[in-house]
Amino acid sequence: MTMQQALTSLTDGPELPALIAGAGDRTAWRFVEFFTVNIRNANTRAAYGRAAGDFLRWCEGRGITDLRAIQPVHVAAYIEELQGTRSAPTVKQHLACIRMLFDWLVTGQVMPSNPAHSVRGPRHSVSKGK
C-alpha cells in the first residue's frame, strides 16, 4: 500500500494536515502509520483522525508552523478550550489521541519529546445507579 492509498482510506481524501506535510516524508509516513498500524477499529480510527486533524489545525491557527514547536502549553490550552464546548469523555478522547500520536512520532524519531505527556485531562467518572 502506498502512502497515498493509506491516506485516502484514512481521511477520505488525499490531504495531510499542513503541519505534518511540512515536516517531511518521514513524518508524513509515520502519521499515516499511526492510524493504519495502531488502530484496528474503523470507528476509533475515524474519531482519532478527526481529533488529530482538529488539534493540528488549531495549532496552525495559532501560528505554529513547525510540528517540533508544539509545546505542552499548546496542548494544555487546546484541551482547556475544548472543555468549554465538548463533553469530558470527548475531551479525554482527544487528549488520548494526541498523546498516542506524539508517542508514535517520538518512537519513530521524528519528534524529540511528547508535548502531551504531562498534560492532564478533565476528571470524569461514571456513576452507576443502585
Locate the predicted segments by residue.
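Short N-terminal helix-initiation segments at or just after the protein's N-terminus
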Residues: 17-20, 108
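Short alpha-helical hairpin
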Residues: 19-33
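N-terminal core-binding DNA-recognition domain of tyrosine recombinases/integrases
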Residues: 29-46, 53-129
